[in-house]
Amino acid sequence: MMKVRPVERRDLADIFELAGKTGVGMTSLPQNEQHLAARIERALNTWQGSLDPGEQGYLFVLEDSEQQKVVGVSAIEVAVGLNDPWYNFRVGTLVHASKALNVYKSVPTLFLSNDHTGYSELCTLFLDPDYRKDKNGPFLSKVRFLFIAAFRQYFSRKVIAEMRGYTDEQGRSPFWESVGRHFFSIEFAKADYLSGTGQKAFIAELMPKHPLYVDFLAEEARAVIGQVHPHTAPARAVLETEGLQYQGYVDIFDGGPTLEANTDDVRAVRDSSKRTVVIKDYDIEDYDIDPNGRLYLVANDHYHHFRAILMNTHLSDERLRLTPESAEALGVAAGDSVRIVSLFAPETKR
């Protein structure tokens, strides 16, 4: 069975192995054991309530119970930019006009921005390539919304997600080559790694404080502004079906888009509801679990011992029938409450 749970210290080796499969461009999961260990500790301290909001970050793992192995991760930062500045480019417009010359021209620009300061961030989503099947990807991504819905008081009014921008097969970023290289004089992979391991002071020190004219960039760079890496396209689609949208903000390194939404308007947050657990052995004649039913995310409401699974079911009343195996995976007993939401919007066919 596949289940999502909070990260534990014993997961470090598996997460380090996962980090080696991410490739260039995933700044929040560098293959650095010391950094990953610190990230795990920060998550544990977040659950213990010992950190300020600007330091808090939840880290979840997708575990294959049969193999006893972590095969994916996803995370939520509670409030970005409160300790270290949060940078991106806002894609804007400057108008150059002259009545005397009868000239009026709109020029696209990139403005260095801290506009998302204080927002909650969905981040660090990565799934082992061998497990990119059976709806594991949407499960790992959207389960964060059930956690947010259950513990809404901990999160901002807005949620954002930075999408990995385009890089070629050699790990080269056209956007970086046309923008970042001129200011940093280092390779994209190096800047990416420094940012991912928390060494971000160089961004504030070296990034331009004045708007950049998009027309001055190479055509190859202009073409990838707001575009995602091919491997990230499914993750973007998952979030867009939940209501997150691109609003003209891009990553300062690779030009990838930032998606955003009002937290309470996210479909899985808004539509999630509670059900009372009934535990029964499997009987197809009187049991709600049905391979032809709708896929649902199901999670307990235990803050420190959060658990979530994916199941097929037909909802007929305020109860949710679980097998003993599913109840054990969730850490719930008969009469407990669970939170549930369909994996996809009802009108979305999958």
From Swiss-Prot:
Active site (catalytic residues): H229
Any Pfam family hit: AstA
Catalytic activity: succinyl-CoA + L-arginine = N(2)-succinyl-L-arginine + CoA + H(+)
Pathway: Amino-acid degradation; L-arginine degradation via AST pathway; L-glutamate and succinate from L-arginine: step 1/5
E.C. code: 2.3.1.109
EC class: transferase
Gene Ontology BP terms: arginine catabolic process to glutamate; arginine catabolic process to succinate
MF (Gene Ontology): arginine N-succinyltransferase activity
Binding site for succinyl-CoA: L125
Matches recorded under InterPro entries: Acyl_CoA_acyltransferase, Arg_succinylTrfase_AstA/AruG, Arginine_N-succinylTrfase
Keywords: Acyltransferase, Arginine metabolism, Transferase
Family: Belongs to the arginine N-succinyltransferase family.
Purpose: Catalyzes the transfer of succinyl-CoA to arginine to produce N(2)-succinylarginine.
Record-given protein name: Arginine N-succinyltransferase
Record lineage: Bacteria, Pseudomonadati, Pseudomonadota, Gammaproteobacteria, Enterobacterales
